[in-house]
């Protein structure tokens, strides 16, 4: 009677593995089960630690930028320089905010169509022939075909 059948042995092994596994709790003592992939923290505490770590990095970076600016201001005289790139960036922001058709100035809201020339149009002016589009579709198509289908040259065969 000291021998056990295979079925009984497997049942005991399964029960042993179930009882030996222990659940670890969160390292922040919030009472939720922890995940080893998140440094033995629950998901909520792990996300909170990531946010606080990212905020610390941003704050230290902004302090460095502020100190660098103050050093530059002290060492050089104040000059006001307006760069054309900054002006273009401001104009692009203004264009993105306005939701009006560039052809008829009609409000388009969320139904506007953005053309490849960069303008926003209503349903009547969305096609390139309706708004005198400055984008060259033929050249862009040729370049795309040339990029996607490179010329393949085979090695020459040596005749014997």
Curated annotation (Swiss-Prot):
Zinc finger motifs (AN1-type), residue ranges: 95-141
Gene Ontology biological-process entries: protein autoubiquitination; protein ubiquitination; response to osmotic stress; response to water deprivation
Binding of Zn(2+) 3, residues: 115, 117, 131, 133
Molecular function via GO: DNA binding; ubiquitin-protein transferase activity; zinc ion binding
Zinc finger (A20-type): 20-54
GO terms under cellular component: nucleus
Binding site for Zn(2+) 1: 26, 30, 42, 45
Cross-referenced PROSITE patterns: ZF_A20, ZF_AN1
Cited InterPro entries: AN1-like_Znf (IPR035896), AN1_A20_ZnFinger (IPR050652), Znf_A20 (IPR002653), Znf_AN1 (IPR000058)
Pfam families for this protein: zf-A20 (PF01754), zf-AN1 (PF01428)
Binding site for Zn(2+) 2: 101, 104, 122, 125
Alphabetically ordered keywords of this record: Metal-binding, Zinc, Zinc-finger
PANTHER family named in the record: AN1-TYPE ZINC FINGER PROTEIN (PTHR10634), ZINC FINGER A20 AND AN1 DOMAIN-CONTAINING STRESS-ASSOCIATED PROTEIN 5 (PTHR10634:SF22)
Function: May be involved in environmental stress response.
Protein name per its UniProtKB record: Zinc finger A20 and AN1 domain-containing stress-associated protein 5
The organism of origin for this protein: Arabidopsis thaliana (Mouse-ear cress)
Gene: SAP5
């Amino acid at each position: 009677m000291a021998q056990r059948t295979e079925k009984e042995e497997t049942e005991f092994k399964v029960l042993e593995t179930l009882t030996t596994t222990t659940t670890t709790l969160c390292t922040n003592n919030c009472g939720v089960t922890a995940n080893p992939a998140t440094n033995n923290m629950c998901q909520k505490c792990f996300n909170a630690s990531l946010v606080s770590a990212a905020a610390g990095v941003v704050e230290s970076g902004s302090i460095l930028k502020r100190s660098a600016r103050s050093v530059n201001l002290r060492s050089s005289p104040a000059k006001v320089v307006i760069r054309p790139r900054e002006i273009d960036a401001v104009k692009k922001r203004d264009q993105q905010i306005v939701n009006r058709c560039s052809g008829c100035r009609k409000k388009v809201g969320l139904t506007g169509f953005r053309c490849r020339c960069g303008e926003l149009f209503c349903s009547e002016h969305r096609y390139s022939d309706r708004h005198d589009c400055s984008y060259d579709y033929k050249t862009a198509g040729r370049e795309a075909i040339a990029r996607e289908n490179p010329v393949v040259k085979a090695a020459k065969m040596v005749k014997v």
